[in-house]
């Protein structure tokens, strides 16, 4: 975690916790039968599943809910983190790293994607965070409270933009890119979004082809949202490969490509 990020993040009462944002729409949930339900029913069913499986370990607090997302707080538990890591594809070898991080009191939220998380009824779960523009950075840049992560996750481009133009903007400097993004994002969220897109692509953590395909999917399906949670998941692999420092202790659990805001 950067010094600036640590200062912003540790000043929040949520510092000792992980905050999860769980979307209730996506291929994994459709396969599990949840996607066939009405939006409110999806939320109810997933909330019951989460409560039943995670509450056994204690310290589960639901922060907010809506038609398509649930936000809840689960206090740090090294054993829980190790369990998730060991159940993740290709991550069993990282248990020692997480144990050492826990002993040192470091945040160890960047544990990539959690596949087929059994305690959530077989739904495909992806544990995402953004290693370049982190929630702590969002707090520092925007002045928003940490609880506003629900809004930040749903930052969206307001209108179709050509993929070629987005690619060009990702290669520009900060001033040029910020100017291009102006009007497409709420002003308070502008720098966080533009910074993430530019940093993720230019650093090589997020390959342009993946970024392009992701954006095309949203556009082709009539949803112009570029969700931080989805993009953060791809960038996370760079963290595990040592291409970027691990930074913060807020994790976004994303069950698939979502729609709308809470």
Regions found by a protein language model. Give the residues of each.
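ATP-binding glycine-rich phosphate-binding loop
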Residues: 5, 13-77
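ATP-binding glycine-rich loop module of kinase domains
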Residues: 61, 65-103
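Conserved hydrophobic "DFG−1" position in protein kinase catalytic cores
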Residues: 73-74, 84, 126-129, 239
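Active-site-adjacent loop/helix micro-motif of nuclease/hydrolase catalytic cores
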Residues: 89-97, 136-141, 261-262
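Conserved structural core of kinase catalytic domains
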Residues: 110-205
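Extracytoplasmic/periplasmic ligand-binding sensor domains
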Residues: 199, 213-217
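Protein kinase catalytic-loop region centered on the HRD/HxD motif
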Residues: 217-227
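Catalytic activation segment of kinase domains across protein kinase-like and atypical kinase folds
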Residues: 226-262
């Amino acid at each position: 975690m950067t010094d600036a990020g640590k200062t912003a993040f540790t000043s929040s009462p949520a510092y000792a916790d992980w905050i999860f944002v769980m979307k209730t729409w996506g291929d994994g949930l459709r396969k599990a039968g949840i996607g066939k339900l009405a939006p409110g029913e999806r939320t109810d069913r997933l909330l019951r599943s989460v409560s039943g499986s995670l509450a056994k370990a204690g310290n589960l607090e639901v922060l907010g809910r809506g038609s398509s997302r649930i936000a809840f707080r689960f206090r740090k538990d090294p054993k829980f983190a190790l369990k998730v890591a060991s159940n993740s594809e290709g991550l069993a070898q990282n248990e020692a790293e997480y144990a050492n991080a826990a002993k040192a009191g470091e945040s160890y939220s960047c544990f990539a994607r959690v596949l087929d998380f059994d305690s959530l009824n077989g739904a495909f779960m992806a544990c995402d965070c953004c290693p370049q523009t982190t929630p702590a950075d969002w707090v520092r840049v925007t002045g928003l409270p940490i609880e506003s992560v629900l809004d930040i996750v749903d930052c969206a481009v307001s209108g179709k933009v050509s993929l070629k133009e987005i690619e060009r903007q990702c290669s520009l400097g900060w001033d040029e890119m910020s100017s291009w993004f102006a009007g497409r994002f709420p002003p308070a969220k502008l720098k966080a979004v533009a910074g993430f897109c530019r940093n993720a692509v230019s650093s090589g953590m997020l390959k342009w082809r993946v970024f392009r395909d992701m954006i095309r999917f949203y556009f082709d399906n009539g949803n112009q949202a570029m969700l931080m949670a989805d993009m953060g998941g791809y960038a996370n692999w760079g963290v595990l490969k040592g291409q970027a420092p691990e930074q913060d202790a807020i994790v976004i659990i994303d069950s698939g490509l979502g729609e709308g805001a809470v």
